[in-house]
Swiss-Prot record:
This reaction introduces a second double bond into the aromatic ring system. The gene is aroC1. Pathway: Metabolic intermediate biosynthesis; chorismate biosynthesis; chorismate from D-erythrose 4-phosphate and phosphoenolpyruvate: step 7/7. One of its GO terms (molecular function) is FMN binding. This is Chorismate synthase 1. Coiled coil: none annotated. One of its GO terms (cellular component) is cytosol.
Length: 390
């Protein structure tokens, strides 16, 4: 599977075209809208979320509630475009209109794509950069991820994300009895945190940052249960599943770090405390005593839950902006201010779920793939039976 996205933050709409989804997958707009609504929630979001109520339109590739095997086109309207029609319109402006145009950006924000992107593409108005580099684009990445989640769910694979740290406040209680319990608890939390006490402290940290005109980041974790053993590859570097997952997490706006399993903690432990001992029983086949590897060894799945974490830096747009330079005058100025969130970590956990789900669904279709969901399901069932008795 593959997809591309198009659209600007304040343009008329966001679009994604998805190729390679098997035929026979049950899919309706509500499957996608549910994920879009989850992305819009979360403590610390800005005023934009009060304007937009993201709803997807399925333009192609689905008929009567089932995928056809042809490309799927999804569109999400930007309601805020009504206030930006002249500024973000596709038609050329007159010389006078260009002089009168508001919201031209010439003061780049430290930590954002503004300056680097303007230099790369030769834009004197950095709005041309920030409109596309905005995290608004993750709306349609979540839409594509919702399709991938649907593929996984049909194959008995569950995906859930949660927040384990915001602004230096760490969740101490992160245990759960089932992935359904994890989902239930996090969906009820304003910051998508399993630890209620830590969640309350995270809310206070977000409030403090907002009142100071600042922003804060954090860490999200995605857990996936039900993946078969041996998905991915050790044969080539670019087919290793952990490498693909790491790239997917790092592709999310403002993410600066990733780890799988115990991750960087492995540097502090001897091998005897890191590697997961192998067990076998007749009912389950091969399992592990622990899951320090996070469900991945040698670029392939082990059959244990996949555990991936990502670090999100504080959002670069600050209401008490940092020092910058006006690219027209070269004079020092404080950076431009755009409407923004004080913390988007809870929402980012939903985006992280989406990109992880996409990579896993793609890997499954590549390995067991045919053009029909029923045949893929049969192939995976045969593989699981083979692996249990290996």
């Amino acid at each position: 599977m593959r997809y591309i996205t198009a659209g600007e933050s304040h343009g008329p709409q966001l679009t994604t075209i998805i190729e390679g989804v098997p035929a026979g997958l049950p899919l309706v707009a509500d499957d996608i809208n549910e994920e879009l609504a989850r992305r819009q929630k979360g403590y610390g979001r800005g005023r934009r979320m009060q304007i937009e109520t993201d709803q997807v339109q399925i333009v192609s590739g689905v008929r009567h509630g089932e995928t056809l095997g042809s490309p799927i086109a999804l569109v999400v309207e930007n309601r805020d475009f009504a206030h930006w029609t002249k500024i973000m319109g596709a038609e050329p402006l007159t010389e006078q209109e260009e002089k009168e145009m508001k919201r031209k950006v010439t003061k780049p924000r430290p930590g954002h794509a503004d300056l680097n992107g303007a230099i790369k593409y030769g834009h004197r108005d950095m709005r041309n950069v920030l409109e596309r580099s905005s995290a608004r684009e993750t709306t349609v990445r979540v839409a594509a991820g919702a399709v991938a989640k649907k593929v996984l769910a049909e194959l008995g694979i569950a995906v859930a994300g949660h927040v384990i740290e915001i602004g230096g406040v760490q969740a101490k209680e992160t245990t759960y009895r089932s992935i359904e319990e994890l989902k239930s608890i996090t969906e009820a939390s304003p910051v998508r945190c399993l630890d209620e006490e830590a969640g309350n402290q995270m809310i206070k940290a977000i409030d403090d940052a907002k009142s100071n005109g600042d922003s804060i980041g954090g860490i999200v974790e995605v857990i996936v249960e039900g993946m078969p053993i041996g998905v991915g590859s050790y044969v080539h570097y670019d087919r290793k599943l952990d490498a693909k997952l790491a790239a997917a997490i790092m592709s999310i706006n403002a993410f600066k770090g990733v780890e799988i399993g115990i991750g960087f903690e492995a540097a502090h432990r001897p091998g005897s405390e890191v590697h997961d001992e192998i067990l076998w029983d007749e009912e389950h086949g091969y399992t592990r005593r622990t899951n320090n590897a996070g469900g991945l060894e040698g670029g392939m799945t082990t059959g244990m839950p996949i555990v991936v974490r990502g670090v999100m830096k504080p959002i670069p747009t600050l209401y008490k902006p940092l020092q910058s330079v006006d690219i027209d005058t070269k004079e020092p100025f404080t950076a431009s201010i755009e409407r923004s969130d004080s913390c988007a970590v809870p929402a980012a956990s939903v985006v992280a779920e989406a990109v992880v789900a996409w990579e896993l669904a793609t890997a499954l279709i590549e390995q067991f793939g045919l053009d029909r969901m029923d045949l893929i399901r049969e192939n995976i069932e045969k593989h699981n039976e083979y692996a249990r008795g290996f």
